[in-house]
Amino acid sequence: MTTPKPVVLCILDGWGSAEPGPANAPYLAKTPTLDAIMQSCPTARLVTHGPDVGLPSGQMGNSEVGHTNIGAGRVVAMDLGQIDLAIEDGSFYDNDALQAFIAKLKETGGAAHLMGLVSDGGVHGHVTHILAAIKAIRDAGVPVWLHAITDGRDVAPKSALTYLDQLEAGMAPGAQIATVTGRYFAMDRDNRWERVSEAYDAMVKGAGQFTAATARDAVENAYGRDELDEFVKATVVEGFDGIKEGDGFFCLNFRADRAREILRAIGEPGFAEFDTGPRPALAALLGMVEYSEGHNAYMTTAYPKRAIVNTLGEWVAKQGKRQFRLAETEKYPHVTFFLNGGKETPEVGEDRFMPKSPKVATYDLQPEMSAPEVTAKFVEAIRAGYDLIVTNYANPDMVGHTGDLDAAIKACEAVDQGLGEVVAALKDAGGAMIVTADHGNCELMVDPETGGAHTAHTTNLVPVALVGGPEGTALKDGRLADLAPTLLALMGLDQPEEMTGESLLV
């Protein structure tokens, strides 16, 4: 067969497959391009959750997991399952890095400050991991202060009290909640340093916008101010007055992208994104995982990353091919760092472009986000002679997370409008494109149980379609790990033996 060029992977982030209905944004949106693709091109569906992407059964997928599996071309055992298993078999409590952290604090007499996302969403962190870490440290006699980050995004928007109750019921004696802050502030990933500084001031200085007698009061007071869990303003619980010299800090989130900024503020030498004031000298700074090569310079790690050999990008580079990666800020790490198996440096012949995500408080205020700029660069790349292009449209996921159905519909329409230009350019170039998603989200915008907004990912299958493929080709159902082998097959390249995924082409 004639090898198409370019071969393209277009990821519609958070665009799941579901029955038509009043909460299904892709169904309600006017999407003539995608409708035509789904009607006239080979299509199938992919699994994006649970063991098929290296997660525990029933655990919804997410963008980090999705892009890691896509780029690896094999099912990658993810950190959530690894940590869960370690807690279950007891090896977590004997973890070398954790024991060294405890030993350092026993030496200095300092307290351990733990920070984590208090929910069971399992995307960035898990309440059971927090409880296990508290137990390990309290069993060693070290005082514990917990900096609780409320979720409301990977779980229901007003569920924080349930998780705080679970936390306080299971928390080892002698541990106290020091601060309560919504993830909007503590887990930014878009250089909104004004948000991060509010979380920093509460955690490090003990100086929040608000104070409360208890963690429960902090959340109830936030609800009184009409703040949902994600947006709880930094609140200091009475009795906490900041991190002291000789204390230690342990970040329990196991996903890198939304932990990096707050950790830079707390530990990076020469940090200058905002004025932190004098920072207390920490005796130890520990992370559940590796957050970046830069963070490794001043942090230790409980669960270092495992090398993924011969990812899609690495293998394509080894064949002397040129490739291009494209996404706006919110999803840029996913098409670069995560797709390349946790490797930050581009491969030889790998070019990248990142339009900036719009500076709005929440993306329902600008549901088109930077899709027009992504599309313009996408079309330019198709015409530029690359062999492989990987692009991510952030809109369906980022706007889906706001819970605003009308905005999610507009987000889908903005992406479809861009796809129209892309398909035309692809046809002119003689290329082929796989269109799919990394997980579901915007196809379920109303919680079927509560009737309120649904802001989390789903476990729905996602669509996959082949545009401009070889004549007579069909697609079979599969999982995300099958996408890299499919792209390689379209490029006329053998897949490396490490890739255990199977081409979807039939």
Curated annotation (Swiss-Prot):
Pfam families in the record: iPGM_N (PF06415), Metalloenzyme (PF01676)
Positions with a binding annotation for Mn(2+) 2: 13, 63, 438-439
Cofactor section: Mn(2+)
One function term, GO molecular function aspect: phosphoglycerate mutase activity
Cofactor binding remark: Binds 2 manganese ions per subunit.
Active site: 63
Positions of substrate binding: 124, 153-154, 183, 189, 255-258, 331
Keyword Metal-binding: yes
Catalytic activity from the UniProt record: (2R)-2-phosphoglycerate = (2R)-3-phosphoglycerate
Superkingdom as given in the UniProt entry: Bacteria
Alphabetical GO biological process terms: glucose catabolic process; glycolytic process
Cellular component, GO annotation: cytosol
Entry's EC annotation: 5.4.2.12
Keywords in alphabetical order: Glycolysis, Isomerase, Manganese, Metal-binding
Transmembrane segment boundaries: none
Recorded family membership: Belongs to the BPG-independent phosphoglycerate mutase family.
Biological role stated in the UniProt entry: Catalyzes the interconversion of 2-phosphoglycerate and 3-phosphoglycerate.
Record's protein name: 2,3-bisphosphoglycerate-independent phosphoglycerate mutase
Source organism of the structure: Ruegeria sp. (strain TM1040)
Lineage: Bacteria, Pseudomonadati, Pseudomonadota, Alphaproteobacteria, Rhodobacterales
